Amino acid sequence: MKRYIKNTLLASVAALTLCCNTACIDETTPKDMAVPGQIASNSKSLQYLANSLPSFLVTWNTYGSTYYTQDWGYPCQMYMRDLLCADFPMSDNGYNYWIYTEDGSSLRYAYYYSYFYYYNFIKNANNVISIGNQAVNGGNEVAKQYLGQGYGYRAMLYLDLVRLFEYKKTGVKALDDEATTLGSYGVTVPIVKETTPTQDLYNNPCAPFYTMYRFIMTDLNRAEECLAGYTRSIKAYMDRSVIYGLKTRLWLEMASRFEQSAAYLQKQIEAENADDGYDKLGINSAADCYAKAAHYAQKALASDGYHPLTEAEWSDPTTGFNTANDSWMLGTLVNSKEQINELSWYTFLGWMSAETEWGMGTTKYNAYRCIGKALYDKIGDNDWRRASWINPNDAGASTVPSGYKTNVSGEKWSTLPAYCNLKFRPGSGNTTDLTVGLIASLPLMRIEEIQFDYFEAIAHTQGVAAAAAALQEWVNTNRYTDGSYTCNATTMDDFIDALMIQRRVELWGEGLVFFDYKRLNLPVTRKYSGTNYASSMQLNSYDGYVAPWMNYMIPETEKDHNPAVIVGPNPSGAITAE
């Protein structure tokens, strides 16, 4: 058998031994971890401390395992989220180290690495907040910008955790019944703050959603206050526009939840005056949340300097999706050889850049990430994004067909499979030297995402007709060459379908549409006529429910150290390929 079995099994064995829990967060110090007792409260030291946050985005092997195929920083989390959706098949799975995650048969260990990574990242943020507060309280006004980074990053991480780990109904009766028995509904993950006493980590229950939302919003409010007047030097730091984007994400998450459940809305309202020190939300309806989402999206969109990617920027063989530009609101920053891992199969571009001679996208491995046929077929002929993936009629050609922006030779092109992605380019466009090609950044939030959030929000506040017209104008202005795109939606369901097509095309590979699938209870459909998913991965989840594999589970080892948590049902094998 090929190497994926060996690597997956070894990674699983390592995961079995993880102390990847909030109790052990006090005991574990991975590399790039900032430790408060080691850093003085002066501006230079605070800057160093705050730098640990963007640094941890691209830190790999945080657990310290020999095999870390599922432990290569935040880009790894992005990659995993997309492979759990419907648009991310691999051309050949012989070297697919994620095969048992992607086919849904063995999911728990991949979740464990996510849990461990996020909580160690949160420890970094807590350290920044702890020392930042000390400095600000001591009169150091410059420290506010670093304190704002701590609050902003912590809010982003907890918002991810909530949306990953909260159990939502799947339509699989056995799983959903088990979730009821366990008490999984309506609870999220444990909250660990900079002030949480060590002893509390060993009896730290999962926070209910109505507490978690207010906790995250409080962090965002504090970040917004701290970052007033701040101008950042790099886009791996947050400024107020990013905080507005995060608030947009959070308000839209709440809006969808409360629209679906009046009971959950009532619980949120009842928790408004809880004595926990968190800010009030000040809402009484899902409509209030949609209005807030639209408000903060507008604030983000109005921030100076942003514009949607142009065709030239998107498809640039040298800088496409590897270099920050005026579309990026937040991104990783990799600008030196010291930051890269030369084992390319433990890197994002090692899996995602098809043009290289050094990654998994070569004839040696044939592990090309492709777009799902169903989505590709929905991209209009006059949508210039269509050339981000190889048309089946152009695959195998001995010369590069017209319409594609690439520097590869005809010989290399002839090896690329149908639907193969060309979206993510190697650093500096270098296809031959991985020590150059891996020096590349990635977007974590783009202005286009927030624009789509705005369209969804106004569909609920201004009506479907207004939102459909706005979406149509935006797509024709920014993505079509001839203005031929039409959005004829007259119902909310039809509009969401149209908007999701645009989200899935625009944000392919960026690890974001997972959250929309889960938020909106959308089915993942991989089995259909002509599908390019391997037979074992042709999983179809149930309409109106969350795909089981999108409910991450807290590690059982967390409960060993922190018995107050609720470990949800294991979704492995809940739905299988037919």
Predicted segments with their positions:
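Sec-dependent bacterial lipoprotein signal peptides
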Residues: 1-22
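Hydrophobic-face positions in mid-chain alpha helices that act as interaction patches
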Residues: 268-447, 482-483, 496, 506, ...
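Short coil/linker segments at helix-helix boundaries
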Residues: 164-214, 218, 257-295
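Membrane-proximal, proline-rich intrinsically disordered regions
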Residues: 23-79, 322, 350-353, 359-366, ...
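Extended amphipathic alpha-helical segments enriched in small hydrophobics
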Residues: 155, 247-248, 444-474
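Inward-facing hydrophobic residues that define packing positions of alpha-helical scaffold repeats
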Residues: 122-125, 213, 220, 290, ...
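Conserved, well-structured interaction surfaces
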Residues: 90-168, 202-212, 220-233, 435-442, ...
